[in-house]
Amino acid sequence: MSGFFGVTSKKDCVFDLFYGTDYHSHLGTRRGGMAVYGKSGFERAIHNIENAPFRTKFERDFDEMEGNYGIGCISDSEPQPLLVRSHLGNYAITTVGRINNLDELVQQAFRDGASHFLEMSGGNINATELVAALINRGSTIAEGMRLAQEAIDGSMSILVLTQDGIYAARDRMGRTPVIVGKKEGAYCVTFESFAYLNLGYTFEKSLGPGEIDRITPEGAEVLLPARDEMKICTFLWVYYGNPASTYEGLNVEEMRYHCGDALARRDNIEADGVAGLPDSGTAHAVGYANRSGIPLVRPFIKYTATWPRSFMPTNQKRRDLIAHMKLIPIRSLIENKRLLLIDDSLVRGTQMYGTTNFLFGSGAKEVHIRLACPPILYGCPYLNFSRSASEMELIARRKIAKLSGEHADITPYTDPDSPEYAAMLEEIRSELGFTSLRYHRLDDMIASTGLSSCKLCTYCWNGKK
């Protein structure tokens, strides 16, 4: 994943830009960047943040940069923001999304006269550079952003910094949020709504799907109105959104309480304590405990000072190491106890296997696993939130292949009342060593959001676009 933040202010914007961008650090662990526009023109800094946090890497830039307009990003892929000089003028650009037809668009750009694209390490082309090339096909920034989004198969939200303000475009299907905040003399635009709260901003608006606005210190001007159809990523609430954020009027923490509540209403397990796997599983566990009456406990504590999210690193051994080292057991709360552990999801199963062994090794009598979303059956074609190289890395798909063959019809396994679904769960439970296993039902999860199912993307669970 990635996240971005932008500021337009009548005063220097660097303070707000620095901290607003930093508040997106949970969305990526590879690179951070900031670009500002002021009296000296455009300034930009990009740093690798794999081994040090954003604030540490950008301290010097924070002291040296100045300007009234700025954009920043936390990126889990390409370096950005990029500085661009084109017939549209000079600008800086940052993006959040995924381009599935990148090679096709690059070849089309060559046919249209583009001479080259800079290659990143690993042989990949910077997707943000390609987006800039697509924007440059337009006669204006706004028209170019529209053309870029129409050409892209996948999803793409964009911030473009110019001397006239920040142009903000939300993905055409609204898969990721773009939110505008305001305070006296300044407006900001952000992925995470909580990122501006401690900076003194209040909520102004959410851009609708495909909407393009120009943000200035005076306000947000709509250049292209929103489309009606929306498919916002449901996994925002389940896992990778910050608990303090609100999307489409629904707070992440509250939605997780609702998920836990719904899980408990369909469960009848006896346990000595309910625990959430930190951090995203914690709120789900609160909802479960409140509904079930089973005490909420913390049998392990997350050491937050230095360990990042284990979901992010590309290397499996690195992910497993982080998942293990960041959790410190409290043996007196584990030994001889029947524990019910809730996590947001189960992707490959390696980390939950390690956590279960960790609890049994610390003396747990039983370990019951509850997941706050349905089995993940498909890789996401819209956002880079999963590091699985293929769908056969997904533990649910591996078990389906074992039961019915690699090319089996998946449909029966999406029905939580079917015998095929029950067989898949038993295969997963047995391999990972859980005492019992239950997933959140898709219908219950959708109900937990309070939003219409037609507005939510559920592709990774049921394959429906």
Could you describe each region identified by the protein language model?
Residues V14, N101, R175-T176, Y196-L197, ...:
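Flexible loop/turn segments at secondary-structure boundaries
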Residues Q108, D112, L134, A151, ...:
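Generic, well-ordered alpha-helical scaffold segments in large soluble proteins
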Residues S121-E129, L296-R309, L403-A408, F434-A447:
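A conserved beta-strand->alpha-helix junction
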Residues M1-G208, R214-A271, L277, E366:
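Conserved short alpha-helical segments that host acidic/polar catalytic motifs at enzyme active sites
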